[in-house]
Amino acid sequence: MGAIGLMLGLQNQVAQNPFGDSSISWIMNILFYAVFVVFMFYGQRIQMMVMLREVEGSLHKLKYIKEEGRKTAVETVKEIGKPQADPAARIDRFLEYFTIGPQGLDPAGIVWKLEHILDVRDTRFKDEVKLMAPSADEIQANNLENTLEAAMALNYIYKIIRHFYLLGKKTYSLYVVMQIQMILPMVMKEAEAYASALKAFAFGQPIGDGAGALVAAKLMQGHETRKIAKDCVVATVPFEGRTAFVIKAEGPGGNVGKPGDAIKEVIDENNGNVATVVMIDAALKLEGEELGEVAEGVGAAIGGPGVDQYKIEESLVKYHIPINAVIIKEDVGDAVSPLRKEIFDSVENVIERVRQVVLERTKEGDKVIIAGIGNTIGIGQ
């Protein structure tokens, strides 16, 4: 409505000078009514054209980020995997993979159906990486898998935004365009985070999501570890007069493991004789909260589709074991970007919080489980 405001101002000036040129007054009046009529009948269309222009600009940026992600994935596979043939075509096919969730009309047993689908997906991805990069070792293969998944996420984000942009342009529906335009800032922030994650995965650098795994790695440092469950390790560590079973995903490759199975197995090995479980994980911070801020509470601190959380809660209920949680607050971008100093510096604070929880909630001689949750890329045992 800026043009209408301008015309009103000019009209007022003319009205204040009644002895001015009458032709100028007529021109101003005609222009004012012309602009008013245009905005009355075509205001919504003009507004939509402005929105489409904004979405189009973001779409071009998303396309560039997506193409750079694909390029990084191809170059990393070539450098590490040393394939005989060009992997670009297979990578393009990989980027279009999808996963169909289980039918939820009958919820009984849906967790096991979901776990089966996720296991099949994980196996398929690992097989694809082996075919693309035959020379990669296990750690490199895990990092490549994470790299490709980040590139896949960027490809998916771009296609969704493009879909609504073209749909809005085709139907000329203000509400279709308005919806996508309103969430664009958050979408762009997420896309830029995945772009940062691509480089971290390609170079095997720790990421913000690995904060929990980093705490566990510090606690188990210098102690013998053993494999437990899939892609998980556990170390028996003396901790403030208690016996602590410290669990994390097996690093330093990009892994999250199956902490649900690992915690269940340790509980079963000790016949439920566990005083408490303490879970450590990164959590989404709210605007205004400090990066790396530490908080504690109760419950299974673990993200993902829910399979591991379900298994942990089932084991805890079976033996009536209390569960405590310590979280490190991060932005969504920090979680998948290279580990920031503020998050790294918070690790000692987290260990101190865990120490307080163990001292206050258990007694000497008790057994406790401390589980560091998160992607352990770049973090060893």
Question: Where do the PLM segments sit?
Answer:
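Short, strongly hydrophobic alpha-helical membrane anchors
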Residues: 1-23
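Alpha-helical membrane-embedded segments
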Residues: 26-44, 212, 216
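Membrane-interface capping segments at transmembrane-helix boundaries
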Residues: 45-49
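Electropositive, gly/pro-rich neighborhoods at or near active sites that engage anionic ligands
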Residues: 50-214, 218-220
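Conserved mixed alpha/beta catalytic, RNA-binding, or beta-rich assembly cores of soluble enzyme
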Residues: 160-338, 344, 374-381
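Conserved acidic residues
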Residues: 275, 366-368
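A short, acidic, amphipathic alpha-helical segment used as a generic capping/interface helix at domain edges
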Residues: 347-362
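Short beta-strand immediately N-terminal to the catalytic nucleophile in serine-hydrolase-like folds
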Residues: 371
